[in-house]
Structure formats: structure tokens, C-alpha cells
């Protein structure tokens, strides 16, 4: 890629990144206002109890692979493939641990309803892990317009799901399913726009190299987003 072409793509990426952030904030504000009128504070509290577990699991799951793949000078299919299967295995392991830890979480908060709610909510880790490789492919190729369409479309669909469920009395389940629908739509669209597909080859050699890249270098992704 020539310097001129890279500059043009970076400039477009900055534009679409800013546009995406603005639209997402407006959508979040709009959907948030509607949901606040339909739900009680206790409904948000139920989901909020799981936030710390979600944050820790999400950090462990992604592991900086998107930025590492974006930074790597030459990225091959085997690199994306290694990240896909490694992330899926890690997220599945985390989910299994949290699945069996659900009763302990519920006991800690003295809220039995958290058992089924947490087991549903934590499914998002497994689903989102499958989008790491194709999303990294889009960022690597500076296809920020596509990631903008993906993010906005996912927000709209999940917002409609959340409002519909909340309006029909699903309470905190509506919030949980809104999150799951957002992750699911985003994962599907990442595959659709990237045209990247995993192969059943389990070579995790690139994982160590990508981990070192993430630790030692900044990333274009940080600038664009």
C-alpha cells in the first residue's frame, strides 16, 4: 500500500470513526431514555451486579489480539485462524467456569434470580469471541466504514429488541437479551463484511508472537477509534 493510499484510508477512517461514535452516542441516549421509562431501577441493578464479572472476562477474552493483528506488518490467514480458535477456547472455558459459579454469585448477592440471568448473560463471551478475528481483519484493512455500519446496525437491532421485551414485561431479561442480540448481530455482520472464514487447523504458534506485538507497540486502532 502506497503512502498516499494509506493516508487517504486513514483520513476516511478518522471520519467514519468520528461519525460512528456520534451516531452511537445518540442511539444509546435515545434507547436509554425509552428503556428508563419502561424499566425500574431494580432491573438495571440486577444486570449491574454482573458487570464486574463481565468486565474481567471480556478483558481476558480479547487479550489485545485485535490491536496485535492490526499492528503486525504482514498478517496471514493462519494468524487470524489461531486467534479465532484460541479466543473461542478461552471464552468457552471462562463461560463454563462462570456457569458453575453462578450459584455462588447469586449467594453472594443473596439474589437467586441471578443464576439463570448470569448464565444467559455470560453466553455473550462465547459469541463475541468469534468476532475478534473478522473484526481485526476489518481494522487491519482500515475498513472503518464497514465497522461503522456494523456497530450502528447492531445498536439499532438490539435497541429494538430491548424496548420490545421491556414493553412486554420481560424486565431485566430485556436488558440481558438486548446485550446478547447486540453481540450476535455484530458477530454475524463482522463475518459478512470481512468475508473471512476460519479453518479447522489448530496451530497456535502465532499467539505468542501476537502477544509480544500487543505489549511492545501502539496501534493504528487506538488512533482511529
Put a short name on every predicted segment.
Residues 1-6, 10, 145, 188-216:
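Interhelical loop/hinge segments that connect adjacent transmembrane helices in multipass membrane
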Residues 213-214, 218-225:
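Single conserved hydrophobic/aromatic residue that forms the stacking wall/gate
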Residues 9-63, 90-102, 124, 154-163, ...:
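Signature of the first transmembrane helix
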Residues 2-11, 36-42, 54-88, 92, ...:
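Transmembrane-helix boundary and interhelical linker motifs in polytopic inner-membrane proteins
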Residues 14-19, 141-151:
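Short, amphipathic, aromatic/basic-enriched membrane-interface segments that mark the entry/exit
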Residues 36-50, 72-82, 95-122, 165-176, ...:
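Membrane-interface helix-capping segments at transmembrane helix termini in multi-pass transporters
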